UniProtKB/Swiss-Prot annotation:
SS bond list: none
Parts of the chain that traverse the membrane: 23-43, 45-65, 93-113, 117-137, 145-165, 171-191, 216-236, 241-261, 277-297
Catalysed transformations (reactions): heme b + (2E,6E)-farnesyl diphosphate + H2O = Fe(II)-heme o + diphosphate
Protein name: Protoheme IX farnesyltransferase 1
Similarity field: Belongs to the UbiA prenyltransferase family. Protoheme IX farnesyltransferase subfamily.
Keyword Endoplasmic reticulum: no
GO cellular component, one term: plasma membrane
Organism per entry: Pseudomonas putida (strain GB-1)
Keyword Membrane listed: yes
Length: 297
């Protein structure tokens, strides 16, 4: 009876929320960048449309699994307690079937409109996030988002391979940028939500090692990110426009990390977290703009 009542309360908006659409959109921006950077010619409309749709569907499926596995944790945290599974508006079994349908459709589109390598790399990313990170690493180690961050860093590689059909050094550099970005992004949020993570018994770095230690590591990773973000220019993958944008964006990120480390602002942690999202969005847009500027010179 409870299942029936929950099912009646569920709406299409609940299922959409399970896919973490804002996160998927950011991932698809990096996937688009990978696609366009992979070629000096245009990207075919079928790869552009169905390739990104396939990647997005698989990412959404992984997000749904994350909701299912974390539903009890989500119910304990103020940030997540209104999620559909945490509130019982969607039951676990229908959610898992929805995740499976998304993943199967996404894989089918990738196999039909891109290539097998893209499909299998996407599947590996999906399993890395949904199974390795969500099912094990998140509860096992304070380095959870460092190790598990590789799965979330894959979209530019997936976009590149969808167009080129092979893996090369350039898309791996884009993966490295997101990989270096992930720790300061999530640890800033973890500082802001430290008490909630402790209540849910999630070993995030601020919970296990304290805020000062975490702030130092945010600062160090932000320095690494700044250096890594300049590599596309160093290997002639991008030009002066990207270099200028990467420096401005990276130095601003470093300023946020320094303010957080010094403890001079009461809301520096959430400010750093929010800026990190804008940073990644703007950095990959700069990559795209610079790419087409170079093509038209």
């Amino acid at each position: 009876m409870a299942t029936l009542l929950s099912a009646r309360r569920a709406s299409w908006r609940d299922y959409l929320e399970l896919t973490k659409p804002k996160v998927v959109v950011l991932m698809l921006i990096t996937s688009l960048a990978g696609m366009f950077l992979a070629t000096r010619a245009g990207v075919s409309w079928s790869v552009l449309l169905f390739g990104n749709l396939g990647i997005g569907l698989c990412a959404g499926g992984a997000a749904v699994v994350n909701h299912v596995v974390d539903r009890r944790i989500d119910a304990l945290m103020a940030r997540t307690h209104k999620r559909p599974l945490a509130q019982g508006r969607v039951e676990p079994l229908p959610a898992l079937l929805f995740a499976l349908a998304l993943a199967l459709l996404g894989m089918a589109l990738l196999l039909a409109f891109t290539n097998a390598l893209t499909a299998w790399l996407t599947l590996a990313s999906l399993l890395g996030y949904a199974v390795l990170y969500t099912g094990f690493l998140k509860r096992a180690t304070p380095q959870n988002i460092v190790i598990g961050g590789l799965a979330g860093a894959a979209p530019p590689l997936l976009g590149w391979v969808a167009v080129s059909g092979h893996v090369s050094a350039e898309p791996l550099l884009l993966v490295l940028i997101i990989f270096a970005w992930t720790p300061p992004h999530f640890w800033a949020l973890a500082i802001h939500r430290k008490e909630e993570y402790a209540k849910a018994d999630i070993p995030m770095l601020p919970v296990t090692h304290g805020e000062r230690y975490t702030k130092l590591h945010i600062l160090l990773y932000t320095l690494i990110l700044l250096a890594v973000s300049l590599l596309p220019y160093a290997i002639h993958m991008s030009g002066p426009l990207y270099l200028a944008c990467a420096l401005v964006l990276g130095l601003r990120f470093l300023q946020w990390a320094w303010v957080l480390y010094r403890g001079s602002r009461p809301h520096a942690a959430i400010g750093t977290f929010k800026y990190s999202i804008a940073y990644l969005f703007a950095l990959f847009i700069a990559l795209l703009l610079d790419h087409y500027l170079l093509l038209n010179l």
